[in-house]
A protein has these predicted regions:
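N-terminal targeting signals for Sec/Tat export/insertion, comprising classic cleavable signal peptides
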Residues: 35-55
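Short beta-strand segments
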Residues: 51-53, 78, 91, 140
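Surface loops and adjacent helix of pleckstrin homology
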Residues: 43-45, 83, 175
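Short, surface-exposed loop/turn motifs at beta-strand boundaries within globular domains
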Residues: 33-35, 48, 73, 88
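N-terminal post-signal-peptidase region of extra-cytosolic proteins
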Residues: 26-29, 36, 53-82, 123-127, ...
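Exported/periplasmic cell-wall-interacting domains
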Residues: 72, 86-186
Length: 186
């Protein structure tokens, strides 16, 4: 009788863990950056958790064809790859840019070599951060202002391709994100 109870207890525990794990996964946050509306929205499923207004993006707008140093924000789907809490921009949420689509376009357009394409592909396949120093650019993220000028932030798109919030906003955003959080920039 005790063996049956122990087995049932283990089965019940396993079911609880599976249900809780799937609910946690379903309840995970994702970020949508709308470059046209200049907003960053935190979503959980179809529910809006928080929208940050008046974000800043790259000083020369947005693109699907990013090049290193073009000061444009790359459009696409990424994940938060790392979090730097000691950044000159206060806090930096590094994105897994370039993604496979950017690498494919870069190879077709001959902006990157086949070896660079393979490196990006391998890193993404292994769940690692793709190479950040290719002709496609890198070190794209969501960050605060650091010691930057709030007036400039409120009036201009000023970044080198990143998405910028105020320091207070990035602090608030941190409660919903972690390494692995999906980020769509559109």
């Amino acid at each position: 009788m005790t063996n049956i109870r122990q087995i049932l207890r283990h089965v019940l525990l396993l079911l609880v863990l599976v249900v809780c794990g799937s609910q946690a996964q379903a309840g995970s946050a994702r970020i949508i950056v709308d470059t046209r509306a200049e907003t960053l929205t935190v979503m959980r499923g179809d529910t809006v958790i928080k929208t940050f207004q008046d974000i800043a993006i790259g000083r020369y707008g947005k693109t699907y064809f990013k090049r290193q140093g073009d000061n444009k924000t790359p459009l696409g789907n990424y994940r938060i790859g790392w979090i730097n809490r000691d950044s000159r921009y206060y806090i930096f949420l590094g994105l897994t840019y370039p993604d496979q689509e950017a690498a494919d376009r870069g190879l077709v357009d001959e902006r990157i070599s086949e070896a660079q394409w393979q490196e990006i592909r391998r890193a993404l396949k292994e769940g690692k951060i793709p190479p950040q120093k290719t002709p496609l650019g890198g070190y794209i993220g969501i960050h605060g202002l650091g010691q930057g000028d709030m007036t400039v932030h409120q009036q201009y798109n000023w970044t080198n391709g990143c998405v910028a919030l105020t320091n207070a906003e990035i602090d608030q955003l941190l409660q919903w994100v972690r390494v692995g959080t999906p980020v769509e920039i559109r």
